[in-house]
Design a protein with these regions (language model features):
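Second-shell loop/turn segments in exported
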Residues: 44-51, 106-108, 142-146, 169-174, ...
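Residue-level signature of the cytosolic catalytic core of signaling kinases
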Residues: 54, 58, 105, 132, ...
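Short active-site loop at a secondary-structure junction
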Residues: 65-75, 96-158, 194-205, 273-276, ...
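Short, solvent-exposed loop/turn and secondary-structure capping segments
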Residues: 87-90, 168-174, 241-245, 384-385
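Active-site helix/loop module of the DD-peptidase/beta-lactamase fold
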Residues: 103, 108-112, 124-166, 170, ...
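The feature captures the short pre-catalytic strand/loop hairpin that immediately precedes
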Residues: 181-193, 257-270
């Protein structure tokens, strides 16, 4: 089953074709009673705007994807030329329930949440409340690194995973139920892998020091700060940073594992909200992407966006994780809470996430102000390829079956399918003037 947002129906039908908006007899359409910024921006589309994405083909590909055994529910959004041009839900919130995923269905973002924390810190830095070049100890006293490195590692080093720790340090202890604040204090017991700022290694427990510094700087709990300074001004009404926020949503997707078996909800990574705590529906994720493209300068100006999207460290092993795309994928970098890539000569920015029955992705071209977001509620990573199919449409590149829909089964254990939560890699850092 699938649903669409029927907003400004006549204008959208002209833009994407009546077939994209038509409701099939066995589908469930969703019409939101209260207009949101997403609705308003959809309604403002001009039929004269150039469209590079073939939305009929995209919808066909997504329908094919949903026939795969591991898929339960999914929501996808596309922004083109700075405006939302596609919002659609597919499948079910819970396998066998008959409850459809709609553009209003809330999912978990997992590690795509890191971009929210980095954006929040960079916004505070622009206001002069945080110095990105100052020692992280100045703002997050709970973080104690080996050899006293909290006094040498900068805030920028924290946001770009250059703290000199082995990858995913103490994730296992976090998953055992230990308190993340306590764990950050005990990182001092580890052996350093390098001097801060000189190598890269993905973190969750340590990275969440970002939420501590936001709370200490604003005087607000992290969720309230994010809501006040980011979600409310952007118009992200469904955005939340807690398990209660997810479960309290009118429509929310339940997590599933292999065989469409439901998984229990756990709050482990909500305890490190800067690393993996965000929830929202696909509408609001698309609005978030618009803001990251510079379309809401009153909320996020070019100074903040340039700071967080800049490529601070080369991550060659990311190319290993994404090796099936190497025909077009060049250098991979990490910025502040964001990955970036050279793809067919274009600089693109994004992130993936995965946690306990949820997966997510965001990828966009800041120059073209175009990109894609997706959320789904199963442990399969096969949709990781959708973003590159959309990019190929935007760049008018020859079609490649990046979704591997012609394969009988996806290679679920391949490196490129690893989620961002609980996975990472190490690489030498490239020193820059910022960071």
């Amino acid at each position: 089953m699938e649903t669409t947002v029927k907003v400004a129906l006549g204008a959208l039908a002209l833009l994407m074709g009546a077939s994209l908006l038509a409701t099939r007899p066995n589908s469930h359409a969703n019409d939101s009673a209260t207009p949101t910024k997403a609705h308003l921006r959809l309604a403002s589309l001009s039929t004269e705007d150039r469209r590079d994405v073939d939305y009929a083909l995209l919808d066909q590909r997504l329908r094919m994807l949903m026939t795969k055994p591991a898929m339960v529910g999914m929501a996808v959004g596309v922004v083109e030329n700075g405006r939302i041009t596609f919002l659609r839900g597919y499948g079910e919130t819970l396998a066998g329930s008959g409850e459809p995923v709609t553009p209003d269905t809330v999912f978990r973002w997992a590690s795509v949440s890191k971009g929210v924390a980095a954006t929040m810190v960079a916004k505070l830095a622009e206001q002069g409340k945080i110095d990105l070049q100052a020692p992280v100890a100045n703002y997050a006293p709970d973080l104690k690194l080996p050899a006293g490195n909290e006094n040498r590692a900068t805030v920028g080093d924290l946001l770009s995973h250059r703290l000199g720790l082995y990858r995913n340090a103490y994730d296992n202890k976090l998953e055992e139920g230990q308190d993340p604040s306590f764990l950050r204090q005990t990182l001092v017991q580890l052996n350093p892998t390098c001097e801060p700022g000189t190598c890269w290694s993905y973190q969750n427990v340590a990275y969440d020091a970002s939420s501590e510094m936001v709370s200490r700087t604003t005087g607000l709990p992290y969720e309230q700060a994010v809501r006040r300074y980011l979600f409310n001004p952007i118009g992200m009404a469904s955005g939340s940073v807690s398990l209660a926020g997810l479960e309290g949503s009118r429509s929310w997707a339940r997590p599933h594992t292999v065989g469409k078996r439901p998984l229990p909800l756990v709050d482990t990574y909500y305890k490190v909200p800067g690393a993996g705590g965000i929830n929202s529906n696909i509408k609001d994720m698309a609005l978030w992407m618009e803001a990251q493209m510079g379309e809401m300068p009153d909320v996020l100006d070019d100074g903040v966006l340039n700071t967080i999207h800049a490529p601070y460290v080369v991550t060659p092993s990311e190319r290993g994780r994404l090796r099936k795309f190497l025909e077009r994928l060049g250098t991979a970098w990490y910025g502040y809470g964001w990955r970036s890539y050279d793809y067919a000569g274009h600089h693109i920015v994004g992130h993936r996430g995965g946690i306990n029955g949820y997966r997510s992705l965001i990828l966009f071209d800041p120059q073209k102000k175009s990109g894609v977001v997706a959320l789904w509620n199963s442990n399969t990573s096969q949709p990781g390829g959708l973003e590159f199919e959309v990019m190929d449409m935007l760049y008018h590149l020859p079609f490649r079956d990046w979704l591997e829909l012609n394969k009988t089964a996806p290679a679920e254990t391949a490196l490129e399918t690893e989620p961002e939560i609980g996975s990472g890699d190490s690489a030498p850092a490239r020193k820059r003037s910022k960071g």
